[in-house]
Curated annotation (Swiss-Prot):
Subunit structure, interactors included: May interact with the exon junction complex (EJC) composed at least of CASC3, EIF4A3, MAGOH and RBM8A.
UniProt superkingdom: Eukaryota
Region (Disordered): 1-127, 235-262, 755-775
Gene: R3hcc1l
Keyword annotations: Coiled coil, Phosphoprotein
EJC-binding motif: region residues: 7-27
Chain positions found as Phosphothreonine: T695
Protein name: Coiled-coil domain-containing protein R3HCC1L
Modified residues (Phosphoserine): S671
InterPro entries hit by this protein: Nucleotide-bd_a/b_plait_sf, R3HC1/R3HCL
Annotated Basic and acidic residues bias: 1-16, 65-112
Xref: Gene3D superfamilies: 3.30.70.330
Length: 775
């Protein structure tokens, strides 16, 4: 019976060939899946129960029934165990998406890998798999969860501070062999992948985000953005490390060999990580003291190539003196370090600009030197000194960015405020002044020598011309008339004035005579245009050459500005034009005001009296409604019957009443003749008058009801004799009317016929003009 039932059983639908696994290979597939779940252990560690469960069905069929039942029970346990493992592996596969293969940081397996970590991992996983072994596994696993993922995103780059949880597995320094990392390859963060191949230590991470997190001495990796800009990547750890790296703006990083102290492999769930630019920040307790290794000759050359693209064509020579940090001047971002202020010395060609020194403070952050293409430079010669960039000169400058865009160095002199100490100026007095005329310290000396005498003569004219043209100048340029005294007392003369004016300051400040001539040309109505943002904003070109003369020059600027503005303010002040009572004192204004005032009366009187406005009366001629009269001045208690009783004599010929209000009504007659006849009669209770003399309301009522003002014709006299005769003949009943009544109806009908015949004959006689007496 069982064979027949099995023969009649419906066969299940076979799956596709691509997914179909033959019966002979099913046991092998289960073995392979279980082996993969157990961390790729040696084949000697396959449990005995599992081997027995994987025997072919033919062997189990040859056993006795009792053994088969026992084997089936054990097989059921094995199947349950495999299903549990399969569900666990499925959960782990769900947590790691399809990008698991791309995001792993693969490394070679070594013979000297950590034994304690692997044994701990094996002990954690052994109860699940049911395997007991004494040989450690050859694979490290990432922690399953993380405590905190802090993401701080600013612009295109961000800081991810990753701290593994206490439950996450960490490999100590004693467990990991001391070997240097080699052939580190870093991929683009924008592609959500981060591959580090060819590592000698075995580190396997299965996170979704780039998770190559390792700390080792003398190595700081550099992550590459999509545009090729280098980002310093540092790693966090609890142990001391002393990383040092060679970072260049073109994205290259050189690592010095060292030993691995700590390898931390953080990981986390996939839902906690985003595909953003990742920058791991290091908090190292060690120190890095290197100047040549931090930024070598190759880094300098690459920086020079980057800065050459700037319109100023400056070559950058970076000298970094740091004690606890690593600085990359090409990266525009902030790095936390305790190092002192680093100085970026910028050397320029003598034919273009002066020497600029860019001070970079690492506590405040990096400043990108290459971003000054469309911005003008403000140069301040400060009192600090740095290592000489060119022979025979020593200067220190700060490159700032002005608010206005200027890519041309010919406008460079309009935005310069120079101040220098006596010590740099004394050092600048050297035999190489003529050779290094492009430096700003020599610029101040030679410029002071050349224009000391000419500037004194021209400043007086400049103040006079500015005072005359103050009303027409949108931007006031003031100069100090006593500047020559400060220049002569503190500065020495030199012989290279003309060359300095052409090379350093350009053609905008060749001579002060051009400024004087330009201001004099304003009087002759020639154009002198300057760019401005506001009329209240003024550009002051002041030149001071020592710390002691800074206060003096500021005071002189203030006095000159007040003097220039005072000349125009006296003329336009309210006190000079009006007295305390508010009367005008200026005769010119009095003449102007008195001449423009008109004494003629210009008020236009209204043509209409809007207060006594009345609507025009409705003009109704007598011929428009001649058959209508107005009935007025009667008591309010009167009704229609009372008025009809008064005009009862005209009711037979046709008469009707139309009410206007309680005391006014319209009387409509059959003809104008009857209406004129009614106007001739006098009544004691009412008064009558024609419609042309009626009130405005009565006229409006008459015009509104014009089509209803015709008198209604009387209904002709009829009898029911014909109707009664038709009903009797149709129903076949006898009439109940008496003989006398019937004769009276016949008589009325005959009279009506006769009257109708006479009216028709009279109408005809009227048209024919016949005499009606005959009738």
């Amino acid at each position: 019976m069982q064979q027949e039932a099995e023969r009649c059983r419906v066969r299940t639908k076979r799956p596709d060939m691509a997914l179909y696994v033959p019966k002979a290979r099913r046991g092998t597939a289960l073995l392979k899946s279980s082996d993969q779940e157990e961390g790729h252990g040696p084949p000697a560690f396959v449990p005995k129960d599992q081997k027995e469960g994987c025997l072919p069905q033919k062997i189990s069929a040859s056993k006795p029934e009792s053994q088969r039942r026992g084997a089936g029970h054990s097989d059921r346990k094995d199947v349950d165990c495999r299903e549990g493992k399969r569900s666990a592996s499925q959960l782990r596969k769900d947590r790691c998406p399809q990008k698991q293969n791309k995001e792993k940081a693969c490394s070679k397996k070594g013979a000297e890998e950590s034994t304690e970590a692997s044994s701990q991992e094996h002990q954690h996983r052994a109860p699940d798999a049911g395997i007991v072994s004494s040989i450690p596994l050859q694979r490290l696993f990432k922690p399953k969860d993380m405590d905190c993922w802090e993401v701080q995103t600013a612009g295109a780059t961000g800081h991810w501070r990753v701290s593994p949880s206490q439950s996450s597995s960490e490999v100590s320094a004693a467990q990991v062999p001391s070997r240097p990392f080699q052939n580190v390859e870093l991929c683009d963060f924008s592609g959500e992948t981060f591959v580090n191949r060819n590592l000698e230590s075995s580190i396997v991470t299965e996170a979704k985000v780039p998770e190559l997190v390792s700390q080792f001495p003398q190595v700081v990796t550099t992550l590459l953005k999509p545009d090729g800009m280098a980002m310093p990547v540092t790693l966090s750890s609890d142990s001391e490390t002393a990383p040092s790296s060679l970072e260049t703006p073109d994205g290259m990083s050189k690592h010095s060999p060292g030993d691995i102290s700590v390898v931390s492999v953080p990981g986390g769930p996939d839902e906690d990580v985003d595909s953003t630019f990742v920058d791991f920040e290091v908090e190292s307790e060690g120190t890095v003291n290197s100047t040549e290794s931090v930024l070598g000759q190759k880094g300098v050359d690459s920086i020079l190539e980057t800065v050459d693209n700037v319109s100023l064509k400056m070559a950058v020579v970076s000298k970094l003196e740091s004690t606890n940090g690593t600085i990359d001047p090409a990266v525009t971002r902030e790095c936390e370090s305790d190092s002192s202020a680093d100085e970026l010395c910028v050397k320029s060609e003598p034919s273009d600009t002066a020497v600029l020194v860019h001070e970079i403070d690492t506590d405040d952050g990096f400043r990108n030197v290459c971003d000054s293409t469309s911005k003008a430079c403000m140069v301040d010669i400060a009192g600090t000194a740095c290592d000489p960039v060119t022979e025979g000169s020593s200067c220190t400058g700060a490159v700032g960015e002005s608010g206005e865009s200027s890519g041309n160095m010919r406008n460079f002199s309009d935005y310069i405020e120079m101040s220098a100490d006596v010590a740099p100026l004394d050092r600048a007095k050297s035999e190489n002044d003529s050779e290094n005329i492009s430096s700003l310290s020599a610029c101040s000396d030679i410029y002071a020598e050349s224009i000391a005498s000419g500037f004194t003569e021209s400043t007086g004219k400049l103040i006079e011309s500015v005072s005359d043209g103050a009303s027409s100048l949108p931007i006031k340029k003031t100069a100090d008339s006593n500047i020559a005294t400060c220049l002569d007392s503190e500065l020495s003369m030199s012989d290279a004035s003309d060359v300095l004016l052409e090379s350093a300051l350009g053609s905008d400040l060749d001579t002060t005579e051009e400024m004087t001539e330009a201001l004099h040309d304003l009087k002759t109505a020639e154009e002198f245009k300057t760019k401005e943002e506001d009329y209240s904003e003024s550009v002051v070109c002041g030149i001071s050459f020592s710390d002691s003369s800074v206060e003096t020059s500021v005071d002189l600027k203030t006095t000159d500005t007040s003097h220039i503005q005072g000349s125009s303010a006296v003329e336009e002040s309210w006190e000079s034009m009006f007295n305390d009572d508010g009367d005008c004192v200026d005769p010119r204004l009095l003449l102007e005001l008195s001449g423009n005032v008109k004494n003629r009366k210009s008020i236009q009187e209204p043509r209409f009296d809007y207060y006594s406005h009345e609507l025009p009366d409705i003009d109704l001629s007598e011929c428009e409604f001649p058959h209508v009269i107005e009935i007025y001045d009667f008591p309010q208690e009167f009704r229609t019957e009372d008025l009809l009783r008064i005009f009862c004599s005209y009711q037979k010929k046709g008469f009707d009443i139309k009410w206007v209000d309680d005391t006014h009504a319209l009387g409509v007659f059959a003809s104008p003749i009857t209406a004129r006849d009614a106007l001739g009669t006098k009544h004691t209770m009412v008064k009558i008058r024609p419609l042309s003399q009626a009130t405005r309301a009565a006229k409006a009522k008459a015009r509104a009801c014009a089509e209803f003002l015709q008198p209604a014709k009387e209904r002709p006299e009829t009898s029911a004799a014909l109707a009664r005769r038709l009903v009797i003949s149709a129903l076949g009943v006898r009439s109940k009317q008496s003989k006398t009544e019937r004769e009276a109806e016949l008589r009325k009908l005959q009279e009506a016929r006769e009257r109708k015949r006479l009216e028709a004959k009279q109408r005809e006689d009227i048209w024919e003009g016949r005499d009606q007496s005959v009738v």
